[in-house]
């Protein structure tokens, strides 16, 4: 199973992420976002940021997850390539770690700046075999 793919969207970037679990799908969604920013295969998981979030539904939790990661990119130039998280659907909480390093133009390719997560076309579906997350980021 592929981890994520991009789809065409006028002036923005659409991402479809997949995972056998909700956690894997959220991780792959984040990986897709950072693949827009840089080549994540060159991002070494040498530092981490702990993340604790709560939301009112899964879509809101995903929105907050991506926004939190983008906050670290905006404020510290952190780019991420590895994620370890747990989602509790009863309390609608997410806790985990995002692993990566500070962006370095000598090592990391500068692609496109992701300005923000959006609710446009945001959906989280559970199919027979996996979770499918669809969303659009503002560039």
UniProtKB/Swiss-Prot annotation:
It comes from the Archaea. The keyword Calcium applies. InterPro entries: Archease, Archease_arc, Archease_dom, Archease_dom_sf. It holds the Pfam family Archease. Gene3D superfamilies: Archease domain (3.55.10.10). GO terms for molecular function: calcium ion binding. Keywords: Calcium, Metal-binding, tRNA processing. GO terms for biological process: tRNA splicing, via endonucleolytic cleavage and ligation. SUPFAM superfamilies: MTH1598-like (SSF69819). Disulfide bonds: none annotated. Ca(2+) binds at residues 12, 138-139. Belongs to the archease family. Activates the tRNA-splicing ligase complex by facilitating the enzymatic turnover of catalytic subunit RtcB. Acts by promoting the guanylylation of RtcB, a key intermediate step in tRNA ligation. Can also alter the NTP specificity of RtcB such that ATP, dGTP or ITP is used efficiently. This is Protein archease. It comes from Saccharolobus islandicus (strain L.S.2.15 / Lassen #1) (Sulfolobus islandicus).
